[in-house]
């Protein structure tokens, strides 16, 4: 046998310390010992973790009543031995996963090792001692990977429970946290109201789900409105009210027809009504019961004429009016947040001269230019034009009637130039609520009356249609539209009369005289009922005075000239003869 030599033992130990044939130092040995201690601590923590898992699984199974006595003993044994069974299962699963993704982990380990080496201070050991075997490299990379994953992994949101507790007769919501790590329960946690601390993502989701359930059940918290609206949006909603605007061609307006029109306004709740073919002389304004009328016509002829009638609801919101001519008139109302301007027009017929049509659109364009761009604008009336059923984006809709004519083409060009939209072609309605004119024999129907507004205020119009039930003895139908806006009610106040110069004084005096005359004789320009003239087949006479004065004048003329109505073919007879007296009496009876 060979002799035992102690030098061989020391040499073998040194060789074990130096894997690459280098010298072995005490620092290297201490480093290896520290690594062994760290590995031991990790194994101890793993053992404790497996024990906790085993205890939790056993408690869960006991609670569910699924374990027998033998199974409980086996679980106790495995728990006492440090959860070796679970460790073996976990190790096998990890080994399988590691075999499948070894290459991927190696790449990730290299990247993470480089990042860790940059962040941590470098070791003072020589390169020879820092070199490790393949197994140690895998363990180090896996441990680094776990550490980085733990650092990068976001903290799990704390579980939240929504509870309610009565306080002073009201239901107050409190959010409590279940702190598993700190060991505190919801009872130990101090109450906090909403808004004291920032809620987590799960808190917000829980609150959203609770609010949606309350909305579905029709419940709401005390002191909260049914609709949660921001400040600006709530102001915008509360400043809008629904108003009704309309236009009607009445084919001349007498006192009896005016009463019918006012009754229809009250029945349908029309706030602003435009009138075409008024056929009144002069211009001005007058009160009629609860309605106020602005009108404009020719000076001497009872032809054309337009008017705007407003009810008492919007009377005090009027800022002023512009009596342009016998074909157009405008009235401006004060509103929130924008003012309202309404223009009533009566366009020339298709058989009118080209110069008259040109002057009409020129005057209307001038009236639009002096109207503020920010105002809510409506142009209503009888346009005597057919725009057709073809849709023109931004100008007409799909619900027009008939074929487009030359007057309709001119109207579309005017709307395109001024960015206007024809509202009563935008809404789908039955045909009887689309046409605005009917021929006397009832065979033809057309859409020639329109309510036009600016494109930017198109959404404020809620509906537009005709009312066939309204009748005032005209071949046109009443056309109305409902829109949403807030009109400001201005209280009536007496303002002092102030004059800056002589020219202003003259203008103010003229205006005061005109208003005084209109107040004294408001019905002077309204035509009375029509009387027939004998001997003029089909001829009519429009009387400006009262009917009693007209009758007295007519009788006086008959007494002065009794022979004027006797036919020339009757031969003259002696005075006092029977046939002459009989013929005159018959003629008087016929005239009466």
From Swiss-Prot:
Main subcellular localisation: cytoplasm
Tissues in which the UniProt entry reports expression: Expressed in liver and lung with higher expression in brain.
Segments of this protein annotated with the region Hydrophilic: 499-578
UniProt cross-references to Pfam families, sorted A to Z: Exo_endo_phos
Region (Disordered): 1-225, 499-592
Subcellular location: Cytoplasm; Nucleus
Keyword hit for Transferase: no
Single GO MF annotation: catalytic activity
UniProt-listed Gene3D superfamilies: Endonuclease/exonuclease/phosphatase
Compositional bias segments (type: Basic and acidic residues): 1-16, 78-108, 147-162, 185-207, 508-523, 552-562, 580-592
Post-translational modification: Phosphorylated by CK2 (casein kinase II) in vitro.
CDD domains: L1-EN (cd09076)
Record key words, sorted: Cytoplasm, Nucleus
Protein name as catalogued: Craniofacial development protein 2
Organism: Bos taurus
Lineage: Eukaryota, Metazoa, Chordata, Craniata, Vertebrata
